[in-house]
A protein has these predicted regions:
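Short amphipathic alpha-helical "recognition" segments used for binding
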Residues: 113, 175, 190-191, 283, ...
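Membrane-embedded alpha-helical bundles of multi-pass enzymes
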Residues: 1-173, 180-181, 186, 191-215, ...
Length: 531
């Protein structure tokens, strides 16, 4: 039981960035579905937890950059979500298991992405499909639709494999039985009911996934362009793998200024209409208002005659700071602010600090970020901009909030410099691709050491920087005002459908159980005895 479950999780992990073998998600999901057949509740729970470990040990490996013991605890807790989902799947018959399994896994992921401490979308299986043919589904149902499609596709693969294997076994039995004598009333053994159930399950699941992908491809994508914006995302460059406390804030700011000055020189003094700087490249020991940095950034916006959006952290008290995106207009006026809503637990704040300080060294997080409450909309001369700071790009609700408030273009100032590997930067780019598609908006992302990127509303990556390099990524992006199905309805349709599917699966299982008891049978559709 253990090996198939762990292998399923590892295959799902390999579908995620930075590895990006998106196609592995389907046989891996199918392997877990197959393994749950006939298992007792405790064994299903154990199988799901092992699969979760196989997924999150590599998928969330970057968390060891904070603390290895803490990372192991986090991964063990995250693995409980697929464990509980597997517990919620009836072990038989095939139809009940096929109906409930994708739905239960999707509901578990919906909870994982929002709880505890605001959830953790990073590491979700939906990110692996940013590079696959199912990305268009995000227009219909966001990350949960992609998640549901992965698990449903897994059922299709496993059921098809089971049906083929059953057919091969049937042929072997037929050949071994030798010739028959119809005159003597002999008959060739027929296909088992389980084989037929598997074939039907595979067909239905495949049709569901393919039809969803086709519908997503032709669904509203944000509408035609209502205007273009020349944009530049500035990446100052520098070393990676160092915590904020190990880096001189002045050197980070100096690299950003140098990259921006070089851009202006190469452009002959003409700057694009919108310039985006990354998260936290202006780090202040006090408030921004009235500081030298505010004056310098105001002067820079005037000199470039551009809308300048900058990631700023300002200390507001002895225990708190704000993580903001701040916009200056072409005349140097500060025109908008957005405070980050989804804070990184144990990275930007410590929940229950008085408790955890007895268990771990919290010196790396001396202050707690003040949570923002805004929609993310910034009204600027470059147009209405929707801002998500850092890993908020993985939260579908942040982009949706901004678009519903009127945003015509999405911006993501982020900072992944603390991570030495490409895992977090690549997962953020994948999240940006999903975000752009589900909201129907072009998206510009800036990071001080990468990845800086530009993504279209159809999910096409127009440009991506080199990690660690000093670089300016430029593009002409479109502003749009149309809405996607996801912007209109959010996660509700997928959540309702998934909940109904789990209930229907258990109803089928109970009905089949009563029939077995009445007929004195032993199982349907390959369910077999409960182990």
């Amino acid at each position: 039981m253990a090996l198939p479950a762990v292998a399923a999780g590892l295959g799902l992990a390999l579908s995620l960035p930075p590895w990006g073998f998106w196609i592995l998600a389907f046989p891996s999901a199918g392997l877990l579905w197959w393994r749950l057949a006939g298992l007792r509740p405790r064994t299903r729970l154990w199988a799901g937890w092992l699969a979760g470990l196989g997924l999150y040990l590599p998928g969330l490996a970057f968390t060891r950059a904070f603390t290895l013991p803490g990372a192991l605890v986090l991964i063990a807790v995250e693995a409980l979500f697929p464990a509980v989902a597997c517990l919620a799947v009836p072990p038989r018959p095939t139809a009940a298991r096929a109906l409930a399994f994708p739905a239960a896994m999707t509901l578990a992921e919906a909870v994982r992405m929002t709880w505890p401490f605001g959830g953790l979308p990073i590491g979700g299986v939906f990110l692996g499909q940013a590079g696959g043919p199912l990305l268009d589904l995000a227009r219909l149902g966001g990350p949960l639709a992609l998640t549901l499609a992965v698990w449903t596709g897994g059922v299709a693969v496993a059921a098809a494999a089971g049906a083929v294997a059953g057919g091969v076994a049937h042929q072997r039995v037929a050949r071994a039985s030798g010739p028959i004598d119809p005159a003597a009333g002999e008959e060739r053994p027929g296909r088992t009911g389980g084989g037929v159930a598997l074939a039907v399950t595979a067909a239905v699941a495949l049709v569901a996934v393919v039809s969803g992908a086709v519908a997503g491809r032709h669904a509203p994508d944000g509408g035609p362009s209502v205007g273009t914006v020349s944009a530049a995302a500035v990446q100052g460059g520098g070393p990676r793998g160092f915590r904020k406390s190990q880096v001189d804030p002045a050197s980070v700011l100096a690299r950003q200024v140098a990259a921006t000055d070089r851009m202006q020189r190469l452009d002959g003094g003409h700057a694009p209409a919108l310039v985006l700087w990354p998260e936290d490249v202006v780090s202040l020991p006090t408030v921004l208002d009235g500081s030298q940095e505010e004056e310098a950034l105001s002067a820079l916006a005037r000199r470039l005659h551009t809308t300048l959006v900058v990631g700023v952290t300002e200390t507001v008290s002895s225990i708190a700071f704000r993580n903001e995106a701040v916009a200056w207009g072409p005349d140097g006026t500060l025109v908008a602010r957005y405070e980050k809503v989804h804070r990184v637990p144990f990275g930007e704040y410590v929940p229950y600090r008085s408790f955890f300080r007895h268990l771990a060294n919290l010196s790396a997080v001396p202050l707690d970020a003040v949570p923002g409450t805004g929609t993310g909309l910034m009204e600027t001369s470059a147009g209405p901009l929707g801002v998500m700071v850092s890993y908020e790009v993985a939260y579908a609700d942040r982009g949706r909030s901004a678009v519903r408030a009127g945003a015509q273009l999405l911006l993501v100032p982020t900072n992944t410099s603390s991570y030495a590997t490409a895992q977090v930067p690549t997962q953020e780019v994948a999240a940006a691709e999903v975000q752009a598609v589900q909201q129907g908006r072009d998206l510009v992302q800036a990071a001080p050491t990468g990845y800086t990127a530009v993504v279209t509303n159809r999910g096409r990556l127009l440009a991506r920087s080199v990690l660690g390099a000093r670089q300016v990524v430029r593009a002409t992006v479109d502003r749009r005002t149309g809405v996607t199905v996801y912007v209109r309805f959010g996660d509700t349709p997928v959540l309702v459908a998934a909940a109904l599917a789990v209930v229907a699966g258990w109803y089928l299982a109970r009905t089949a159980g009563r029939r077995r008891r009445t007929a004195g049978g032993t199982g349907i559709g390959g369910g077999g005895a409960v182990r």
